[in-house]
Amino acid sequence: MAVETSHDAELTWSLVLPVKPLARAKTRMAEAAGPLRQALALAVAADTVAAALRCAAVAEVIVVTDDPLAAAELSALGARVVPDEPDCGLNPALAHGAALARAARPRAGVGAMSADLPALRPAELGRALAAAAGFAESFVADAQGVGTTLYAVRPGVPFSPAFGPGSRARHAAQGARELAIEGLDSLRRDVDTPGDLRAALALGTGPRTAALAARMPAFSPGAETSRG
């Protein structure tokens, strides 16, 4: 079971976000996005990072990526960009970013968050992090109830992310507390498929994602109806 801790309303957080090389990102969007697929992947990541940086509880956003274009744009937004080490998968990359975060801010909590949350609201992220401050290890499930969009640990707690297919069950099995809080729709709405993006657009995405989607016929008003 998750260990409940004394609640620290003043706890700040370092967030680690992984960003794939754009050439390999959003492949399930290839048909809908066409030649704008890579630009869409970058827009989604940029809107996610920008929203996270506006959250008052977030002291730092660390982006783990080897993509030079993504690195330049996300660094310009204010994120700290580090290379993907040891370059052997998602969870090791997150652990690398978390180690750097703890070296810089040992008294901050550390979270790993999806970079695919273009509708993210800073206030919703803040509510989740405030709840996470009350537990040693916690997570937020995705909108499908199968994956994870946020995994968080308090200072000094081992950082053991288990992202990937079925991560909700894995995080729960290792003792992390699921933060089943109402009103976290934007934090739970990750985007991997055209249907996911339509759901995010309905919530209201950041400006970069909205602008790219407006250029794609698949996401124009009435497109869903026209497919019958």
From Swiss-Prot:
A molecular-function term among this protein's GO annotations: GTP binding
Highest taxon in the source lineage: Bacteria
Catalyses which reaction(s): phosphoenolpyruvate + GTP + H(+) = enolpyruvoyl-2-diphospho-5'-guanosine + diphosphate
Pfam families: CofC
This protein's UniProt keywords: GTP-binding, Nucleotide-binding, Nucleotidyltransferase, Transferase
Extent of the signal sequence: none
Annotated phosphoenolpyruvate binding sites: T148, G164, S167
Metabolic or biological pathway: Cofactor biosynthesis; coenzyme F420 biosynthesis
Keyword Transcription regulation on entry: no
Record's keyword annotation contains GTP-binding: yes
EC number in record: 2.7.7.105
GO aspect biological process, one term: F420-0 metabolic process
Purpose: Guanylyltransferase that catalyzes the activation of phosphoenolpyruvate (PEP) as enolpyruvoyl-2-diphospho-5'-guanosine, via the condensation of PEP with GTP. It is involved in the biosynthesis of coenzyme F420, a hydride carrier cofactor.
HAMAP family (alphabetical): CofC
Annotated family: Belongs to the CofC family.
UniProt name for this protein: Phosphoenolpyruvate guanylyltransferase
Source organism of the structure: Thermomonospora curvata (strain ATCC 19995 / DSM 43183 / JCM 3096 / KCTC 9072 / NBRC 15933 / NCIMB 10081 / Henssen B9)
Gene name of the encoded protein: fbiD
